[in-house]
Amino acid sequence: MLSSTADHLFWMARYIERAENSARMLDIHLQSSLLAGGRSESQRNQSAQAVLLISELVPAFEQSQKNQSKTNPKTQNEHISDAVLRFMVSDPNNSSSIYSALYSARENARAVRGAITTELWETINVTWLKLQARLENDAWMQDMPAFFDWVKHLSLIHISEPTRPY
């Protein structure tokens, strides 16, 4: 019983950390592509491919693109950079996406609901609900730097919540 609780707590924290790391990497990719406004589309695509290589997700991305083109023809004309961002942020089939990481963190927290503080559970649950609202209709793409800052900030809240003096 104790090892099961410890396991869920470990993975809850690990998935929150994974979401933060993904947000940092994607934010750097976004900033570098914005700073180099004169870059060609092929250079932006190479930068997006580098994100996939770092994450070891090239085959998963290619499979996702094949599936997307069958189910949603409007994504065929999407720039590779936007497709990579969407894949890394909101694809529920990508176990490394921010969506999947925060979903898994919430599920692990829910499994040990009695072992964590009410405040921590509420923070994780509200984070999940707000994430769903931001991902709806790709609203997060309207202000990506703010979205990535939000994810990074949330990971700090999760780290500091258990140590906060009451």
Residue locations for each model-derived region?
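Alpha-helical transmembrane segments and their helix-helix packing motifs
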Residues: M1-L156, S160, R164
